[in-house]
Design a protein with these regions (language model features):
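Membrane-embedded beta-strand positions of outer-membrane beta-barrel proteins
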Residues: 22-26, 58-62, 100, 114-118, ...
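Residues that define the transmembrane beta-barrel architecture of outer-membrane proteins
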Residues: 16-20, 39-45, 56, 92-98, ...
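Gram-negative (and chloroplast) outer-membrane scaffold detector with strong preference
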Residues: 53-142, 155-159
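Transmembrane beta-strands of outer-membrane beta-barrel pores
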Residues: 26-32, 53-55, 62-68, 120-126, ...
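Short glycine/proline- and aromatic-enriched beta-strand/turn motifs that initiate or cap beta-hairpins
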Residues: 7-58, 220-227
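Extracellular loop and loop/strand-boundary signature of outer-membrane beta-barrel proteins
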Residues: 30-36, 46, 81-90, 145-153, ...
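Outer-membrane beta-barrel translocator domains and adjoining extracellular loop/strand segments
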Residues: 33-39, 70-79, 127-136, 175-179, ...
Length: 227
């Protein structure tokens, strides 16, 4: 293909109006507000799919992490004397998040593009609880004993926002995956995405809420059909 045509590909003039792709990466998040009273931040592993129509971007991704508890009895279950009747059996609960976002590429220059995104995030925090009872030992002193272990979770939907900063790594022509004589252009990028999402746990005692702020760094691939 002629150099002029390759330059036209870089500015999008030879592409069809749509593209599909994926991203996979790592990152981290920190809770703010009263969320930080009960939870610490954690590393995140992320992956997902993208669809683009001209400058519009639609993104669905999944994030996995294991934050740490600061509060060993977040439901604050006590007996009449103030002793714990529940304690976390899991120091690091499992955090699963599923995000759906839409955005628009507001700036594209050379190898760099910037796309603000907004959407919703469903998250689930799950862990095990020890149920405690108190029994007298041989010295007639009451000691805590684990009576039962059960699983529990907190989940919900919340607003989220992010900004995708894509730095193009390379591009190449490939065969069109749906067959025929057409070709497609595959572009790989380094994607840096700061994000914020709201979260609250009404069942905790006291209830906690705040935002989780974080950053992910991903490899992103995008396939566009050529006119």
């Amino acid at each position: 293909m002629a150099p002029a045509a390759l330059r036209a590909q870089d500015d999008g003039s030879l592409y069809n109006g749509w593209g599909v792709g994926f991203q996979v990466g790592v990152g981290g998040m920190l809770p703010t507000g009263s969320l930080s009273d009960d939870l610490k931040g954690c590393a995140l592993f992320t992956g997902g799919l993208n669809a683009e129509v001209n400058r519009l971007r639609f993104k669905a991704d999944v994030a996995y992490g294991q934050p740490s508890f600061k509060n060993n009895n977040p439901y604050h279950v006590l007996d009449d004397t103030g002793r714990d009747l529940q304690l976390n059996a899991t120091a690091n609960p499992t955090l699963l998040g599923v995000g759906l976002q839409a955005g628009y590429t507001v700036w594209r220059q050379g190898k760099v593009s910037v796309t603000p995104m907004v959407g919703v995030n469903w998250s689930r925090l799950s862990w095990d609880l020890n149920h405690i009872k108190y029994e007298k030992d041989d010295e007639d002193k009451e000691r805590p004993v684990i009576d039962d272990v059960t699983g529990t979770h907190e989940s919900g939907f919340a607003f989220m926002a992010s900004v995708d900063v894509d730095i193009k790594l390379h591009g190449k022509l490939v065969d069109y995956p749906l067959g025929g004589d057409r070709q497609a252009h595959y572009t790989s990028s380094l994607r840096i995405s700061p994000f914020v999402t709201h979260a609250k746990f009404d069942n905790f005692n006291p209830s906690v809420k705040g935002c989780c702020i974080g950053l992910t760094v991903s490899y992103a691939g995008l396939l566009r059909a050529i006119r």
